[in-house]
Every structure is written in structure tokens, then in C-alpha cells.
Amino acid sequence: MTRRRSAPASWLLVSLLGVATSLEVSESPGSVQVARGQTAVLPCAFSTSAALLNLNVIWMVIPLSNANQPEQVILYQGGQMFDGALRFHGRVGFTGTMPATNVSIFINNTQLSDTGTYQCLVNNLPDRGGRNIGVTGLTVLVPPSAPQCQIQGSQDLGSDVILLCSSEEGIPRPTYLWEKLDNTLKLPPTATQDQVQGTVTIRNISALSSGLYQCVASNAIGTSTCLLDLQVISPQPRSVGVIAGAVGTGAVLIVICLALISGAFFYWRSKNKEEEEEEIPNEIREDDLPPKCSSAKAFHTEISSSENNTLTSSNTYNSRYWNNNPKPHRNTESFNHFSDLRQSFSGNAVIPSIYANGNHLVLGPHKTLVVTANRGSSPQVLPRNNGSVSRKPWPQHTHSYTVSQMTLERIGAVPVMVPAQSRAGSLV
């Protein structure tokens, strides 16, 4: 009976010893924070009843930047240490002499990329069972980098401006505090600040808003600042602008007027260049002293050319006065009826008294008339380069006929005194 009772007791003792000798990794503090560039210690310890002859320790990391690619940090196996990922070479090691139940490691010169979740895996054969994994988080803190201060918006009086402040680096994310560097260190009453975004909005800026502003970026391990000088611009006098605008407007108007005048002048000049048909009338000239001629040649025809078709006698009669037809004609054939009057008169003959308009004319020597007729056709129409039409007169021929005064009296001609003209056509 005693043996039966002792058997269950012995089995209970063996089971208790087995539980006591199982491997167990102690709990970690959870998270470790360290500033960038400093040394971080990641704790890990375990308990075991077996000898440490077959101890196997592996440290792994799950980077915060890439959780899908775990990396090996350091390995202890068979009494030797092996390096893990290349970026940890020369920076990682065990804090104690191995083998040992304290398998904590250190990481020198921590970098921002070292942030992540680290796992400690421990195996010590033949010891089995229990929890053999320890988890520790590492956060590498980065102080705020030097922030950049900027002004957004117009600095004119009465405008709204925004002061910006931001740091490229900072873990944890820094907060921003704006202040004006004056006696009160307070922002203007119209300013609204956002410490998370790092902005300050100042509405309706005035001369009191001018000054030096400071932005302080801070987090758990450091601070950094930047300065910004805000100068409100007062409006410039508008008189200068008004004068400049008036001068510019006047200059433009003058240029436009000159252009219009020039255009009108050239248009008028081009119009006046068009040649018009010249009206050349038939003329009757009375000579003071006609040459003496025989009775056979008292009335003769003389063909001559007139240089400028101008009058050369002192008394001039229009040819249509002697024409039976009162309507003027350019054709000089109307004077052919005088060809039948071929009578000769002596140069010394006495002319009887002639009365005109009730006046008694003084007797004098015989006078003759020279009838000058211009024969010409209509002018020729020629096109010009600018689209207008010019008229070019045909060459004209001048014929002169001599008529005695007696003949003129017989047909009832009445002399009329007309002012003499020069060759250029002006009155003398």
C-alpha cells in the first residue's frame, strides 16, 4: 500500500521539476527611445535549467519603413557570433559575455532607419517549452531641423499675410510657436496661429504689424528656430502716377492726330494730281499795225504755232462773237465763211467815223484782226498706277487768219477793249 501511494508522489515531483526547468524569456519594457546618433540598448533575458552548451540566440528587426522585409541583426550559435544585415555591421553586439542568460544587445550610432520592432528568439536544447520570444520596440528620435520661415501674400498696407514655418526633419513631429520679438512677445491682435501647421495669419496688416518674428520648432528631444522680418509697405503718392498717365495719354493722342493729318494731306495731294481736261478757247487777236499788203493778199491765211496758247495782242475778241451761231464750238471751222471776204484796202485809207454806244470814235489808220484758232481733238484717257484715270491731250495745231477792220465793220462787228495779258496769262 505504501509503494502505491509513493508512486503518484514521485510522478508529481518529476512533473514539477520539468515545469521549473522549461525555458522562459522575460518580458521586455516594450519600447526604447533614443536620439539619433546615440547608443540604444535592447534588453532580452531568459531562464533555463539546462546547460548553455547548445544556446542559440537570434535577433531580428521589422523596419518601420518596410514591414514586409524582416532583417537579421545578430546571431549567436554554437559558441560564435555572426553579423546580420550589412547596415548593422560594426554597430551591434551583445552587452554581456556569451553564452549567458542575458542576451541583450546594443546599437551604436543609431540612425532614423533603425526605428522598428526587434525580436529576440532563444533556444537552449534540450530545454523546451515556454515562451522563447521577446519583443522590443526601438524609436530613434530626431530633433527638428532648422525651420524655414516665409511670407505669403502682399505686404502692402491693409493686406492679409501668412507666416509659414516648417522643418524637413523631426521625430516626433515638431510643433511650431510664433512670437514677435518686441517688449510683449505677443502677436498682433488680428493674428491667428496654428501650431501644428506652423502658420500665422495676420489680417489687415498695419504699421504696428511690422517687426521681427521668430518661429520655434520643438519636439521631445530638441528645438530649432528661424527669424522673419515683416515690413509693411505704405502706399506711394498717387500724384506721380496720375501725371505719368496724363503725359502718356497726351502723347498717344498727339501721335494719333499727326497720323490723321498726314493721311488727309496725302489723300488730298493724290487727288489733286489727277489731270483734268484743259479748256483751250478760240481767240481773235487785233493787231495795232498790220503789215502792208497788196490787194491780192489783203486777206490771207497764216499758219503758226503758239508756244503756250497765250494772248499776244492788246485787244482780244472771243471767236464766238463773230460766229452766227451763238452756241460756242471748239471746232474752228466756223470761221471758214470769212474766207470769201478777200478785199484789199490801202494802208493809208481813211476810215469813216464809227459810232459805238453813242460815242464818236477818232479816225485812224486801218487796223486788221488776226483770228487764232486751235484745232485739237479730245484728250486721250490713260490709266494710272494707283487706279485713277488721267487725260493726256492730243497735240494741238494753231491756225491764224487775218481780217481787216473794214471787213469787220461791214459785217457789223463792234470793237471791245479788253485788258492786255502777258504770255503767262496774267493781266498787265
UniProtKB/Swiss-Prot annotation:
Stretches for region Disordered: 376-396
Tissue: Highly expressed in testis and detected in kidney and adrenal gland. In brain, expressed in commissure fibers of the corpus callosum and pyramidal cell layers of the dentate gyrus and hippocampus where it is probably expressed by both neurons and glial cells.
Gene3D superfamilies from the UniProt entry: Immunoglobulins (2.60.40.10)
Transmembrane segment boundaries: 241-261
This protein's name: Immunoglobulin superfamily member 11
Lineage: Eukaryota, Metazoa, Chordata, Craniata, Vertebrata
Disulfide bond entries: C44-C120, C165-C215
Chain positions with Omega-N-methylarginine modification: R375
Location(s) in or outside the cell: Cell membrane
Biased composition (Polar residues): 376-389
Keywords recorded for this protein, A-Z: Cell adhesion, Cell membrane, Disulfide bond, Glycoprotein, Growth regulation, Immunoglobulin domain, Membrane, Methylation, Receptor, Repeat, Signal, Transmembrane, Transmembrane helix
Spans within the Cytoplasmic topological domain: 262-428
Function: Functions as a cell adhesion molecule through homophilic interaction. Stimulates cell growth.
GO BP terms: homophilic cell adhesion via plasma membrane adhesion molecules; positive regulation of long-term synaptic potentiation; regulation of presynapse assembly; regulation of synaptic plasticity; trans-synaptic signaling
A GO molecular-function annotation: ionotropic glutamate receptor binding
Annotated signal sequence range: 1-22
Gene: Igsf11
Record PTM text: N-glycosylated.
Domain Ig-like V-type per the UniProt entry, residue ranges: 23-136
